C-alpha cells in the first residue's frame, strides 16, 4: 500500500490561482512572475504559462511508501551533501535534518536548513535500515518490515548516509 503525504495534483485547494512555489523546498532558485501573479501571466500570454502539474521530484514533496514487507521514504535534498545531512532514529520516529552554511549561488548568498520527522511502523526492522543519497539528490531511507509478532527495539541511534553515483529514477505513483 502506497501512502502519499501530499499528491502533486491536489497541491493547493485553489489550484493554479494560488502562488504555488512560495513555500516549496526550492529555496534560492529564484521566482518568476507567475509565482506571484498567476492571473497576470496566464492572461497576458496563455501559451507561456507555467505547467500546473510539475513533476514529483521538482516539487520538494517527500514520498512515504509502506507496503507489506518494506518501508521507504524518498526526499529531495539536492542542495545538501551527505556531510550536511543527519539521519537518526528516535523512539518511533526517524528525524532527517539538513543544514549547510552560507554559500554563493546565482542570486546571491544563501544558507538552507530543514528538519523532517516521520513516524516509523512498529514492525520495522531497525537493525536493517539503510539510507543513501543518489547522484541527483534524492535521499532514500528504507528498511524491511518484520513479522507482526516481533517488536523492534526503540532507542536513539544515528543512521549513516551513503553516497550513490547513479541518479534515482522518479518513483511511480
From Swiss-Prot:
Entry binding sites for Zn(2+) 3: 154
PROSITE patterns: SHSP
Binding positions for Zn(2+) 2 per the UniProt entry: 107
Compositional bias annotation for Basic and acidic residues: 153-167
Gene3D superfamilies for this protein: 2.60.40.790
GO biological process terms, semicolon-separated: lens development in camera-type eye; negative regulation of apoptotic process; protein refolding; response to heat
KW Metal-binding (keyword) present: yes
InterPro entries: A-crystallin/Hsp20_dom (IPR002068), Alpha-crystallin/HSP_16 (IPR055269), Alpha-crystallin/sHSP_animal (IPR001436), Alpha-crystallin_N (IPR003090), HSP20-like_chaperone (IPR008978)
Binding positions for Zn(2+) 1 per the UniProt entry: 100, 102
Record-annotated membrane-spanning stretches: none
Similarity comment: family membership: Belongs to the small heat shock protein (HSP20) family.
Protein name in the entry: Alpha-crystallin A chain
Organism whose genome encodes this protein: Aquarana catesbeiana
Lineage, opening ranks: Eukaryota, Metazoa, Chordata, Craniata, Vertebrata
Amino acid at each position: 500500500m502506497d501512502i502519499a503525504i501530499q499528491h502533486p495534483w491536489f497541491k493547493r485547494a485553489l489550484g493554479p490561482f494560488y502562488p504555488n512555489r512560495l513555500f516549496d523546498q526550492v529555496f534560492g532558485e529564484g521566482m518568476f512572475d507567475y509565482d506571484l501573479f498567476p492571473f497576470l501571466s496566464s492572461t497576458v500570454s496563455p501559451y507561456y504559462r507555467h505547467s500546473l502539474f510539475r513533476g514529483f521530484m521538482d516539487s520538494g514533496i517527500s514520498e512515504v511508501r509502506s507496503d507489506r514487507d518494506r518501508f521507504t521514504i524518498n526526499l529531495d535534498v539536492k542542495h545538501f551533501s551527505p556531510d550536511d545531512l543527519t539521519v537518526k532514529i528516535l523512539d518511533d520516529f526517524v528525524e532527517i535534518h539538513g543544514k549547510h552554511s552560507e554559500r554563493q549561488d546565482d542570486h546571491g548568498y544563501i544558507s538552507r536548513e530543514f528538519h523532517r520527522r516521520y513516524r516509523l511502523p512498529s514492525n520495522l526492522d531497525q537493525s536493517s535500515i539503510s539510507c543513501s543519497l543518489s547522484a541527483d539528490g534524492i535521499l532514500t531511507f528504507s528498511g524491511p518490515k518484520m513479522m507482526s509478532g516481533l517488536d523492534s527495539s526503540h532507542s536513539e541511534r544515528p543512521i549513516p548516509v551513503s553516497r550513490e553515483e547513479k541518479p534515482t529514477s522518479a518513483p511511480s505513483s
